[in-house]
Amino acid sequence: AGNCCTLKPSELAPATATLLAQLVSEVLPPELVSVVNGDVTTSQALLEEEFDYIFYTGNGNVGKYVMEKAAQHLTPVTLELGGKSPVIVTRSASLRLAARRIVFGKFLNCGQTCIAPDYILVENSVKEELVNLLQEEIEKMYGKAPLSNPDYGKIVNRRHFERICRLIAPE
């Protein structure tokens, strides 16, 4: 009776995956929860196994692959493939609170979470005030030189860094 699960953290964050494995092993028996660390080949091998359910969070291309492999065993799947997460701010909002929450959500893990705000839809009458409050909140969190603050997140790998550079300054 009961459920057990296998967790396969991202290979892009090996230190976090190692810590997760350590913490889980300290509080739960391995027959209940196992953490499997490894690269893409590890993920592919796991998908050859017959699970009762698969929950995947990541990008759409890998999501298609997960769905295809799960279908071979008729395994139900939940795919959390991200998307665009808008923030809507109207004049009735507490702008300071909105700014604080937007900055937290966007700057947590350098915005590299599937629920990070991607864009803001703001009522024109409060746009300027919101922008000023966002700048204040960023400075509160990271100081006047955010890039030299150790709490300011880093991009997970060179490929993502280069993609962002191309978005900012296309060739």
Predicted regions mapped to residue ranges:
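Short alpha-helical
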Residues: 12-15, 40-42, 61-62, 72
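Conserved small-residue-rich beta-alpha loop and adjacent elements
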Residues: 1-28, 74, 96
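A structured beta-alpha segment of the ubiquitous adenosine-cofactor-binding alpha/beta core
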Residues: 34-52
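CheY-like receiver
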Residues: 18, 45-46, 101
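Short beta->alpha connector loops at strand-helix junctions that form conserved
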Residues: 3, 8-10, 37, 57-58, ...
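Structural detector of well-ordered beta-strand residues that form the stable sheet scaffold
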Residues: 6, 34, 76-78
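ALDH superfamily catalytic-core signature
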Residues: 28, 53, 61-170
